[in-house]
Swiss-Prot record:
GO terms for molecular function: ATP binding; tryptophan-tRNA ligase activity. It catalyses: tRNA(Trp) + L-tryptophan + ATP = L-tryptophyl-tRNA(Trp) + AMP + diphosphate + H(+). Belongs to the class-I aminoacyl-tRNA synthetase family. The gene is trpS. L-tryptophan binds at D143. A motif ('HIGH' region) lies at residues 11-19. This is Tryptophan--tRNA ligase. Keywords: Aminoacyl-tRNA synthetase, ATP-binding, Cytoplasm, Ligase, Nucleotide-binding, Protein biosynthesis. It comes from Pseudomonas syringae pv. tomato (strain ATCC BAA-871 / DC3000).
Length: 449
């Protein structure tokens, strides 16, 4: 089976060593596998959320495109495109926006962090918050679901967005699928071995901290940047601790095991920091020198980059265009030439049943809610260690069968295989509780034609 992998980089800055080691290099390695279908894109719509400088965005798009190619991306093996060259993506974003719950978006980490920052500053909670920031998880869901990606490589801080894409995709399937699963449920791919590099000051290398080493800066500028890496004050001849050295962590990400072992040994034997930084520069210059020349050549040929990206967009749209037509048909945005069935020709009456919504708690555990057709919460599950366990339980409930419901004063619980798996809300009295039990049984009963 071929696995489709999708990843994008937001075009708001110049690529640095952290981008390369943490995202670009592992993605290029993965793209060479015979059983992988890779979709890589420049997330320039996302960039508009973070940056209002047109020249910076334009320059960043050019630099990131050139970086991917100079680093060895084979555009004949992958689909490489700009997000803004795929008009189906914003259209799908709107279709998904119309089924995305506001409560789901309220829980997005970036939005909550912005609100919390405003509250701490005694400002209006929504001060400076745009609809772009608030709803960008829907745009990210469209990026993923447009191509039915199986896996999305992300950092741990991005797991929530993949889970939100799943929630939104499930909701669309439930409302419009009529037995068909339009969207594959994507999985977040966490690469534990992928490097998170320290910046010049020891914090995570990030444009936000202004502590980056540009990937393809000139040899002179790279040497100057490396010389500014923070180290301790131990003199040459004094033993250094590699495990607490930002310089060693950086060296480790680019060296072979043999080179790394040698560098560690020399630090323990008292190698001076000045000489250690010189070796760091030599290692990077040898590894990146040829790619730097290719990068500079591509930067000088923007028309060639444009042609490559437009060809990639055509390739991507061969997937996106017919799929979006199916989705438009599903929601009722149909051509008037499409035959419309009426009730006299045997159209079945259908009712919208209950639906399951899964989510992840801040502590990493998984839960699901069972919501009635009108949105009322019928059940809230207990916590599960992983999403698979939660999915097994919700799938069992969807299969119908006798329910083990146990009344407890002003609420009831649901049991499976001798274990309590979900709780009802608290009710005003026993009558309301018993009515809710009947509603739950009806909601989980197999649908009849």
């Amino acid at each position: 089976m071929t696995t489709r992998i999708l990843t994008g980089i937001t075009t708001t800055g110049t690529p640095h060593l952290g981008n390369y080691a943490g995202a670009i290099r592992p993605a290029i390695v993965a793209s060479r596998q015979s059983d992988v279908d890779s979709f890589y894109f420049l997330a320039d719509y996302h960039a508009l959320i973070k940056c209002d400088d047109p020249l910076r965005i334009q320059r960043s798009r050019l630099e990131i495109a050139a970086t991917w190619l100079a680093a060895g991306l084979d555009v004949d093996r992958v689909t490489f495109y700009r997000q803004s060259d795929i008009p189906e993506i914003p259209e799908l974003t709107w279709l998904l926006t119309c089924v995305a719950a506001k409560g789901l978006l309220n829980r997005a980490h970036a939005y909550k962090a912005s609100v919390d920052k405003n509250v701490e500053s005694c400002e209006d909670p929504d001060a400076g918050i745009t609809m772009g920031l608030y709803s960008y998880p829907v745009l990210m869901a469209a990026d993923i679901l447009m191509f039915n990606a199986h896996q999305v490589p992300v950092g741990r801080d991005q797991i929530q967005h993949v889970e939100m894409a799943r929630d939104i995709g499930q909701r669309f399937n439930h409302l419009f699928g009529k037995g068909r699963e339009f969207f594959v449920m994507p999985e977040a791919l966490i690469e534990e071995s992928v490097a998170t590099l320290p910046g010049l000051d020891g914090r995570k290398m990030s444009k936000s901290y202004d502590n980056t080493i540009p990937l393809f800066s000139s040899a002179k500028d790279m040497k100057s940047a490396i010389s500014r890496i923070v180290t301790d004050s131990l003199a040459p001849g004094e033993a250094k601790d590699p495990d607490n050295s930002h310089l060693f962590t950086l060296y480790q990400a680019f060296s072979t095991p043999e080179q790394c072992a040698q560098f560690r040994s020399e630090l323990l034997q008292g190698l001076g920091w000045g000489e250690a930084k010189t070796r760091m520069f030599t290692l990077l210059d040898e590894q990146l020198g040829e790619a730097r020349e290719q990068y500079l050549s591509l930067i000088e040929r923007p028309a060639d980059l444009e042609d490559i990206l437009l060809a990639g967009a055509q390739k991507a749209r061969r997937v996106a265009t017919p799929f979006l037509e199916e989705l438009r048909e599903a929601v009722g945005l149909r051509s008037f030439r499409t035959a419309v069935q009426n009730a006299d020709t045997g159209k079945k009456k259908t009712t919208k049943g209950a639906r399951f919504v899964s989510f992840r708690e801040d502590d990493g555990s998984f839960r699901f809610r069972l919501l009635a057709a009108d949105g009322e919460q019928l059940l809230l599950s207990r916590t599960f260690a992983d999403g698979k366990a939660a999915g097994i339980v919700s799938k069992q409930l969807q299969q119908g069968g006798e329910l083990d419901l146990r009344s407890e004063a002003d609420r009831f619980t649901l049991w499976l295989n001798g274990e309590c798996v979900a709780d009802s809300p608290v009710f005003a009295d026993a009558t309301a509780r018993d009515n809710a039990v009947e509603t739950l049984k009806l909601a989980l009963a197999p649908q009849q034609d």
